[in-house]
Amino acid sequence: PVYIFDALKKKTPEEWKAAYRKSKYFQNFSNNDASSKSYSSMKSPSLNTDFFNQFTTLVSRYFTVTIRDYERQGLMLFIAPVIALLINMLFSGDGAEVKAIFILVISTIWLGCSNAVREIVNERSIYKRERMVNLSIPAYLSSKMAVLLLFSLYQIFCLVGITSMKFYYSNQVGLFLILFYTSIIATILGLLISAVSRTEAFALTVLPLVLIPMVIFAGLVQYYRDMASWIQGFSGIWLSRWAYELSLSNSFSDGVGIIGFDSDGSVVAYGIMTTMLFLFLGGLVWMLKSLDKKK
């Protein structure tokens, strides 16, 4: 059945329409006058309607597939509470919030990327066939993000909620929102890695190469203030560095001085994170469009 997509690709929709109207099927089953009138008066569906229909269908399909994968679903539900409990067990004493928030940021990025990194590469052939019948890239990406971010909301709620039972965050809601924004960017990054990869094994190999520098250059393993100036500059290309600074500024301002971040750097951090979001999203859309040209 999949070969029908290859056959459909040989002609444009207008050519198929013209061929049908000349065929015996059209003559036998259509009233020419009524058909012509109804056809001429018919309005083409709006782009918004088409997007919404595709989006709802894709979300329903993707969510059903996800919840039926019991092993993956179990990991996505239980891993965040386990991480939060381990943070509570390990860190204590004055300034423990600095380390706890660091693990929260790294965990958020790791979960966002790892949740998404298999999504596109695993269904590349399905995606390419559906693009032949007018699958919308915005609808496709929006459906992926909607389901993945639903799980991210739960995971971040667990991370912040459980750790706040032990650690003092001056703004829990603000920390939650910052981590969720970080998760959005990390999820797009994971989808980008998935779109670039030809196999799942390659995607999983690339993932640590992205995540390990996030840990090293976030600003805690080596305090930001103790880094050489050029290393400080290099650390600026990593999402974790800005998410960590923003989280400390919002929820444990004393940690900003301990690490050596700029106490007035929140606006810059937001700006750079937003720039990363659009760069990753632009690269993802470009990669998906490039798949249309590949056989």
Question: What does each of the following model-derived ranges do?
Answer:
Residues 36-60, 232-239:
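Short, membrane-interfacial amphipathic segments enriched in basic
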Residues 1-37:
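ABC ATPase nucleotide-binding domains
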Residues 1-13, 63-295:
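Membrane-spanning alpha-helical segments of multipass transporters and channels
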